[in-house]
């Protein structure tokens, strides 16, 4: 991932914490009761796990479906590569066919008309508070992240070519909706909705 995606796109980040500059990390907090506590696990080195690492088997130690340490700006560049079906600024990362396959549901989480999972990406059904984006053919695509107090989302509309990237930490749950959904809708309503 680091060589074939991150470096090719000119981004800074990766799954292996020991290969990154800790001075560039944001402090991540969890909310515990009435206070915020700095997360101890967010940037824990996995070096002690490496002697027993088996390619293709031990990969969960790096959180391969997420777990990448990256800035919001660089995550937006990565999202734009997916929005352009595998290409960004003339740099092809994956074939258009593979990119479209990644954005096509292959696993039914619930039933038709509810969120569906593709290959590391998913359709967001009933997520955006705009009836248009709750209609088949208009569902936004993306990925959320949540661990150690971090909450992030990259979500875009293949139909209308808009996208949102957001990262927060130490949130308090909002009654009735997931925090990221509320944040995404606030950004959508302020910046995208006509």
Which stretches of residues belong to each language-model region?
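Solvent-exposed loop/turn segments at secondary-structure junctions
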Residues: 68, 82, 147-149, 170-173
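Short, surface-exposed loop or secondary-structure junction motifs
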Residues: 1-141
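Short, well-ordered beta-strand elements
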Residues: 151-170
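Short acidic/glycine-enriched loop/turn segments that link adjacent beta-strands
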Residues: 22-23, 148-150
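Glycine-centered structural positions embedded in regular secondary structure
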Residues: 118-120, 145, 163, 180
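Short, gly/Ser/Thr-rich active-site loops of penicillin-recognizing serine hydrolases
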Residues: 110-115, 126, 134-136, 166-194
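Short, loop-centered acidic/histidine patches that primarily coordinate divalent metals
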Residues: 124, 144-146, 159, 168-169
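Beta-strand-rich C-terminal secretin pore/gate domain
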Residues: 141-142, 149
């Amino acid at each position: 991932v680091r060589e074939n995606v991150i470096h090719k796109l000119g981004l800074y980040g990766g799954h292996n914490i020991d290969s990154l500059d800790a001075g560039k990390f944001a402090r991540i907090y969890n909310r515990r009761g009435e206070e915020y506590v700095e997360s101890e696990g967010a940037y824990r080195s996995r070096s002690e796990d490496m002697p027993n690492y088996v390619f293709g088997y031990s990969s969960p130690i790096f959180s391969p479906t997420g777990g990448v340490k990256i800035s919001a700006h660089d995550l937006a560049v990565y999202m734009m590569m997916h929005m352009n079906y595998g290409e960004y600024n003339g740099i092809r990362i994956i074939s258009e066919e593979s990119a479209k396959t990644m954005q096509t549901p292959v696993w039914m989480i619930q039933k038709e008309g509810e969120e569906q999972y593709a290959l590391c990406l998913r359709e967001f059904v009933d997520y955006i508070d705009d009836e248009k984006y709750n209609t088949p053919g208009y569902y936004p695509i993306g990925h959320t992240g949540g661990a150690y107090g971090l909450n992030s989302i990259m979500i875009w509309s293949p139909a209308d070519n808009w996208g949102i990237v957001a990262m927060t930490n130490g949130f308090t749950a909002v009654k009735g909706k997931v925090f990221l959904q509320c944040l995404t809708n606030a950004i959508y309503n302020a910046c995208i909705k006509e």
